[in-house]
Regions:
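Hydrophobic/aromatic residues within the transmembrane alpha-helices of Major Facilitator Superfamily
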Residues: 36-40, 70, 74, 78, ...
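Helix-terminus/linker motif at the lipid-water interface of multi-pass membrane proteins
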Residues: 40-59, 128-135, 191-198, 261-281
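Small-residue (Gly/Pro/Ala) motifs that create kinks and tight helix-helix packing interfaces
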Residues: 162, 188-189, 193
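Conserved small/polar residues in nucleotide/adenosyl-binding loops
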Residues: 279-286, 294
Length: 294
């Protein structure tokens, strides 16, 4: 057995034999810390857009929440289901099955991203109008979402495989990937918004780049030889049984995100009659609550 295989086996033995209380602490603390750090995405974007672009931009930002909710729902459909299946299969010592889930999850996320990026990119104006955009907020919403769309692929890959990383025995490393993305966004957002004077586009571009950093860090983990689960040949062909097992588990949390989309659509359209000040107020509240894979 090589050193890399020994390290991977040691991780699995720790999951099998360590006290439950210790495992709970080791896995829950990095998760909580990582999620708190990720909230910086929302806080930083909201503050900088408000100061650098204006109050109307916050209203436009609120219109984009349903789009992000739908994209997140598709990511959760795969990410949450794959994470649970990986945990179960590793517990059963079925490493081949866990690897197939990993490969199928990658293909499904890429397919999902291609579909929603294409649909939103082609029909963005009618979609935003249906989601409550007015003549004043549409330009801001369009600018933000068109630049953010490519980054939603990176977001789904980063968060989906971040959860799988945690489930396969690497909670601290999973936390580090989220911290990396948040810090990158904290540095890049002011540069793109103020220094380069790109406004709301700059916020979206900074988020895209930050999530790309996180995605690269996450995906690099799964090509290492010393991990419990890695990308290998022969795991990317979609199998109906594997896809069904992923989707059946991920459907419930995905529906929660989809429901958030429809709630936001109703709120946006209801507020349109009251004017932009109310939209801005609710937009700030919604932005504070929204985060990918919440």
């Amino acid at each position: 057995m090589t050193d890399q295989q020994s390290a991977a086996q040691a991780k699995l033995r720790a999951l099998e034999n360590a006290p439950v209380g210790r495992l709970l602490w080791e896995y829950s603390l990095p998760t909580v810390v990582g999620l708190l750090v990720m909230s910086l995405y929302n806080v930083v974007d909201r503050i900088l857009i408000g100061r650098g672009v204006g109050a109307d931009a916050i209203s436009g930002l609120a219109i984009t929440f349903p789009v992000m909710n739908l994209a997140t729902a598709l990511g959760v459909l795969v990410g949450a289901g794959a994470t649970t299946r990986v945990s179960i299969l590793l517990g059963q010592k079925n490493h081949r099955g866990a690897s197939e889930v990993l490969g199928n999850a990658l293909v499904l996320l890429l397919i999902n991203a291609t579909i929603y990026i294409s649909i939103f990119g082609i029909f963005i104006d009618p979609i935003l109008r249906a989601f409550g955009a007015s003549d004043a907020t549409l330009p801001y919403a369009r600018d933000f979402i068109l630049w953010l769309l490519p980054g939603l692929l990176m977001t789904n890959l980063a968060f989906g495989f971040n959860n799988i990383m945690r489930a396969s025995g690497y909670p601290r490393r999973a936390m580090e990937t989220m911290i990396l993305g948040a810090l990158a966004n904290l540095i890049l957002a002011p540069i793109f918004i103020f220094v380069l004077d790109l406004g709301i586009k700059g916020a979206a571009i900074a988020t895209d780049i930050a999530m790309t950093f996180s995605m690269i860090f996450v995906m690099a983990h799964f090509v290492r030889r010393d991990v419990t689960l890695r990308f290998t040949r022969g795991i990317y062909r979609l199998r109906a049984s594997v896809v069904l097992s992923i989707v059946s588990i991920g459907a419930a949390p995905a529906l929660v995100n989809a429901a958030s989309c429809f709630i936001n659509v109703i709120i946006n359209n209801s507020l349109a009659r009251y004017g932009r000040s109310e939209e801005r107020r609710v937009g700030k509240e919604c932005r504070s609550r929204w985060s990918p894979y919440h």
